[in-house]
Regions:
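Aromatic-lined carbohydrate-binding surfaces of glycoside hydrolases
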Residues: 1-238, 264-268, 298-326, 358, ...
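Extended, compositionally biased alpha-helical segments that mediate assembly or anchoring
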Residues: 287, 292-293, 297
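Aromatic- and carboxylate-lined catalytic core of secreted/periplasmic carbohydrate-active enzymes
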Residues: 323-362
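A broad structural signal for short, well-ordered beta-strand segments within beta-sheet-rich domains
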Residues: 138, 291, 347-348
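Non-catalytic positions within long, well-ordered alpha-helices that form the structural scaffold/packing
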Residues: 28-29, 285-287
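Active-site clefts of carbohydrate-active enzymes
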Residues: 97-98, 248-281, 296-300
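Extended ligand-binding clefts on enzyme/binding-domain cores
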Residues: 212-256, 267, 279, 285-286, ...
Length: 381
């Protein structure tokens, strides 16, 4: 059984109490032990570090931020009552516009925003401290630094560099290493001081920076974990397993599993991945014993009011819950049978015809007994 079995929700539904309660109940019913909620700019919605702008107090913004912290702390306490750990996930660095207006030297004509590592590591420290203090019941934070969604990436992806860029303005790996190391050290120290668990998500804006990021993480205390995607970039069945998963041997590794199907219609159409997922998870465990956790993403941050348990592709999420727990030895057929029985109250082996032809009414046209409409797990039949 995997040590960390996490369920993640990362769209606007995290602010809907009914939706997050459904997430918690789903996790409890299916053997998950960790809840992750997140958005790219989440931390900026929760706190505004003091002393960086002349606008020390904005009643509207402050009230909204405080309300969100109270809400998430309530969710963290609910998770604790259900025996679940609770993490927040976000992408940094992010900041409000007035920060640049108050520190105009950060605006560089050649490179856009100046990466003053002393300033930004201090800003990051104060922001993360505020998040931990505002939501004391949380277990830890999952942070991606310098992703394409951050306002201040340390390096840019190749597609974002045009022919007019001067070569001398491109940041070299040795320079990037120093920036990553300083920021990671700042994150590690502040999260540890708040008695929380830090998970660094290896998700740089440029894939060329992957080795630099891993090198900068290596000197950190072993209590800092890392999160790495199952495939090198996005998801497609033919993509290889991510070799970066094998490069971390001094700390726990959590593998990111995209079950929302960004590249295949977000799970709207059935997309069977059970055998593929089983093979990849077995590879993880055999290839690197430090891979101890998995984060199953149930949504995609750009599509609201949608998550995998409301689609036919839920079979993949259900299979993951089994494969990460005590069902690792089950076959795809057995896992599908279990899912159909739970979701539809239907046992395919009770019928002589094949499961999917029966489900579609193929064959002799005889009606199937019972109601095959999906049963809600969260309300009585």
């Amino acid at each position: 059984m995997w040590e960390t079995r996490a369920l993640e929700l990362n769209n606007q539904d995290i602010w809907n109490w009914s939706s997050v309660c459904n997430l918690v109940r789903y996790a409890s019913q299916h053997g998950f032990n960790t809840i992750v909620v997140g958005q790219a700019d989440l931390f900026g919605k929760l706190v505004s570090p003091k002393g960086y702008t002349p606008f020390h107090y904005n009643d509207s913004v402050s009230s909204q931020q405080r309300a969100r912290c109270v809400y998430l702390n309530r969710l963290a306490m609910y998770c604790r009552e259900q025996g679940l750990r609770f993490y927040l996930q976000a992408k940094e660095l992010g900041f409000p516009t007035e920060l640049l207006l108050s520190h105009k030297y950060l605006l560089d004509n050649q490179q856009g925003i100046l990466f003053d590592v002393d300033f930004w590591s201090r800003w990051l420290t104060d922001k993360i401290r505020g998040v931990c203090q505002g939501i004391p019941a949380l277990t830890g934070l999952i942070i991606a630094l310098s992703s394409t969604d951050g306002l201040l990436p340390i390096t840019r992806p190749k597609w974002d560099i045009n022919a007019r860029d001067e070569p001398e303005n491109a940041r070299q790996p040795s320079q990037s290493f120093v920036l990553y190391r300083r920021c990671f050290q700042a994150l590690s120290q502040v999260v540890s001081a708040q008695n929380k668990h830090l998970v660094l998500r290896v998700f740089p804006a440029s894939n060329d920076d992957l080795g630099t990021v891993l090198d900068a993480i290596e000197p950190l205390p072993p209590t800092v974990s890392v999160s790495i995607k199952l495939t090198p970039e996005r998801f497609w069945p033919a993509f290889p397993n991510n070799p970066a998963l094998l490069q971390v041997t001094l700390r726990d590794v959590w593998v990111d599993i995209d079950l929302a199907g960004e590249e295949v219609g977000w799970g709207v159409m059935p997309f069977l991945r059970i055998d593929e997922l089983k093979g990849r998870l077995l590879w993880c465990q055999s290839a690197n014993p430090r891979i101890t956790g998995a984060i199953c993403k149930t949504s995609w941050e750009s599509v609201d009011n949608h998550w995998i348990p409301e689609t036919l592709s839920e079979c993949n999420l259900f299979a993951c819950s089994q494969l990460l727990g005590h069902g690792a030895g089950k076959t795809q057929e057995q896992l599908l049978d279990l899912w159909l029985a739970e979701r539809y109250g239907w046992c395919p082996r009770c019928f002589s015809r094949p499961p999917f032809s029966a489900a579609t009414g193929a064959g002799n046209g005889a009606a199937l007994p019972g109601d095959l409409r999906p049963r809600s797990r969260f309300s009585p039949p």
